[in-house]
Amino acid sequence: PVGIINADFLREVNLYTGAFPANRRDALSSVIEMYQVDGSKEQFNFRGAIGASDLALTADGPIGENTTYIASVRRSYLQFLFAALELPFLPKYNDYQFKVKTKLNEKNEISVVSLGAYDVNSLNLEANDTEEQRYILGNLPVNNQWSYAFGVVYKHYGENGFDTWVASRNYLDNKAYKYQDNNEVDSLLLLDYESDEIENKFRYEHTSRFDNGLKLNYGGNFEYAKFFTDNFNRTFFGGESVEFNYESSLELFKWGAFAQVSQELFKKRLVLSLGVRADANNYNEHMQNLLNQLSPRFSASFMLTQDWYLNFNTGRFYQLPAYTTLGFKNPEGVAVNKQNDLKYIRSDHFVAGLEVLPDDQSKFSIEGFYKKYDNYPFSLIDSISLASKGADFGIYGSEPVESIAEGRAYGAELLYRNRDLFGINLILSYTLVRSETKPLKESLMDLWWIPTTWDNRHLLN
C-alpha cells in the first residue's frame, strides 16, 4: 500500500512503459525515474503529517552558504487498521530518507542520498472465518526485512553539457518462515529462508546538447554484488514431499556500456532517438558476452499540431534473473541453474500511440502495445514459469530452472499525468491488458497461449 519513497521528496516523476533511456538497465516492462527536491536555501522548515497509514516527520533547510538538506522518517500503524478490518496479514513499516546537496562552485556540485526501511509482515491468526482468509493464512509466510541504499552523485557542468559520476551501495536482508497450519513445531516446518543481497555500483555518463537540436548521452557502469542464502524449503511434487536444505553464496561482477543520440528535425516537429546498451557479468559463459545482451532501442515522435503528438517506439531489453535463482543449489551442493546455462530474460517491445499536451503541467495519452518475453526461468519442479509465481504469496525462485519459458503482454493504455494538480503530482492510468504464457506440457500445447496469474485484464492505477 505504501512505497519506500516519501512523496514529499519528489520533484518530478517520469514513467516509461517503452523506449527506455539507454542509461537505464535491468528493466523489462517499465522504468520510473524519480527526481528529488532540494532543501530550502533560506530557512529551516519542519512538517509533521498523520495519514491513513503512517506518521511522517520531514525537515529541510540550509547548512551553511552552499549546502542544503532534506530528511524524513516514517512509522506505520497500518497493522492496527488491518486488524480492525479482520485481514489475515499485518504489515508494519519504518523508513527514513535524506538528501544533502552542496554546490561547490558554478560548475561543480555533489549530492549525498540515502534511504532505508525495516518491514515486518506478521499473520493475524484470529482472522480465519472465510475460505479466502484461511487460504492466505495457510500460504503466506511470516516475513521481515530491512534494507538501505546510500549514494554519492558528483556533477561537472561544461559548455554544452555535463558529466555525472555515481557511486552507491545497497543492502537487503530478508527473512521468512512458514509452518504447516501455522503450528510452530520443528517437524511441521515448511520454509525457513534467509538471504542477504549487497550491491556496490559505479556509473559514469556524459550528456551533451547542441544548438542544432542534437542530444548525445553515453557512459558505462560497473558493479560488484554479493548474495548469501540459508534456505530450508519443503514442498510437495507429484504427491511426495521434496526438501531443499542448503547454504549458498554468490559473487558477481557486472559491467555495461550505453550510448544514445536524439535529433530534432523539421523545426522540432520530428524527434528521432536511437540508443543501444549492452550488459554482461561473470556468472556463466553466455552471460559474459556483451553481444548476447545487446539492447537496441528506437523511438520517433511527430508533432501533428502544437499540442498533439504521434509516437512510436520499439526495442529489445534484458533483465538479470533474481539472485535467489542465480544462487540456488540442490541438496548435493551443485549450482544446477549455472549448469543449466541460465540466461538474461529478454523482452521485445512494439508501442504506438497518441499524446496530447494541454499545458506545461499535464499530459494525456493513449497507446497500444505488444511485448514479447523470452528466456524466462521455467521451474523444473512444478513446470511453471517464474513469471506466473510473482503474483503469488511467499518466496519463489529458489529452485532448479531452465531459461525456456515464453510470454507476451498486449493491450492498450489510457494515461493522464499532471505535475501540479492542486499541489498534487498525479499519474492516473487505465490499462486493458492480456498477459499470456506458452505452455511447455505436450498435453496443453493445443491451447498455444494460456493466461498467466498477471492476466488481470483491467488495471486502474
Label each residue range with its predicted role.
Residues 17-19, 36, 50-54, 63, ...:
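Transmembrane beta-strands of outer-membrane beta-barrel pores
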Residues 109-158, 163, 171-198:
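Flexible loop and strand-edge segments within Gram-negative outer membrane beta-barrel domains
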